[in-house]
Design a protein with these regions (language model features):
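Short, glycine/charged-enriched secondary-structure capping and boundary segments
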Residues: 9-12, 41-44, 71-72, 94-97, ...
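Alpha-helix N-cap/helix-start motif
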Residues: 5-6, 65, 91-95, 159
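His/Asp/Glu-enriched, well-ordered alpha-helical/loop segment
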Residues: 15-26, 70-153
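C-terminal cap of metal-dependent C-N hydrolases
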Residues: 139-184
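Active-site-proximal flexible loops/turns
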Residues: 5-7, 37, 91, 154, ...
Length: 184
């Protein structure tokens, strides 16, 4: 965070702008300095992040600070949410369940409509959502990696809002979990 965090963020943006091969392949972990920036500075930084195609991978929430996900997404910055692991030493709350993180993000950021909740699914799925903003099917498609969760929900919004039970997990085409039995 703080001044050194801001300088680091701008340094990484500059490096991505200087080297186009880094664009779309560079992510800043945590990036908590963004959560403390004045709005004007945040707007400028978000525009630069989007221009350089530098994404953010952070947590929800971190102590008493909310990351400016909405502002970043509006400018086109790719935003991911993660856990360090199930026993997260930086934040002891939660189970490691990414649907729980997506639910928490929706609650904290005021995403309440079916559409807004459906967009929050991307925080649990490494950016994948089944429908784009216009309702067109975008995932899964033939040729996509076979990494899937099967949840007890009628739609994406319900999966996020109810933290639906995971009934099955397929990773790289292999069944890892089906109902309550582990296949690994």
């Amino acid at each position: 965070g703080g001044e050194s965090g801001v300088k680091t963020i701008h340094y990484l943006i500059d490096k991505a702008l200087e080297n186009p091969a880094l664009q779309g392949r560079t992510f800043i972990s945590h990036a908590f300095a963004l959560g403390y920036m004045p709005k004007k500075d945040l707007a400028h930084t978000a525009e630069r992040l989007a221009e350089a195609k530098v994404g953010i991978c952070s947590s929800v929430p971190f102590r008493n600070m909310l990351m400016p996900f909405r502002e970043l997404k509006k400018t086109g910055v790719e935003v991911f949410v993660g856990n360090d692991n199930v026993q997260d030493h930086w934040g002891t709350f939660g189970s490691g369940n990414m649907l729980q993180k997506a639910n928490l993000a929706a609650e904290l950021y005021g995403y309440e409509t079916e559409f807004e909740l459906s967009r929050c699914l991307r925080y649990a799925t490494n950016g994948k959502i089944p429908l784009d903003d216009q309702g067109n099917s975008v995932w899964p498609k033939v040729g996509d990696d076979a990494n899937l969760l099967f949840v007890d929900a009628s739609c994406s919004a319900e999966a996020v809002s109810r933290i639906s039970t995971v009934n099955g997990l397929i990773h790289q085409g292999n069944v890892v979990k089906w109902n309550n039995s582990s296949q690994a």
